[in-house]
Amino acid sequence: GLWQKIKDKASELVSGIVEGVK
């Protein structure tokens, strides 16, 4: 559902931030 899409987007954002910090 919608919540799953939001969680997926949040995970993508977190992964992007983590990669940027490395």
Swiss-Prot record:
Its main location: secreted. Keywords: Amidation, Amphibian defense peptide, Antibiotic, Antimicrobial, Secreted. It comes from the Eukaryota. The modification Lysine amide is found at residue 22. It is found in: Secreted. Disulfide bonds: none annotated. Expressed by the skin dorsal glands. GO terms for cellular component: extracellular region. Coiled coil: none annotated. One of its GO terms (biological process) is defense response to Gram-negative bacterium. Belongs to the frog skin active peptide (FSAP) family. Caerin subfamily. Antibacterial peptide with narrow spectrum of activity. Inhibits the formation of NO by neuronal nitric oxide synthase. This is Caerin-3.1.
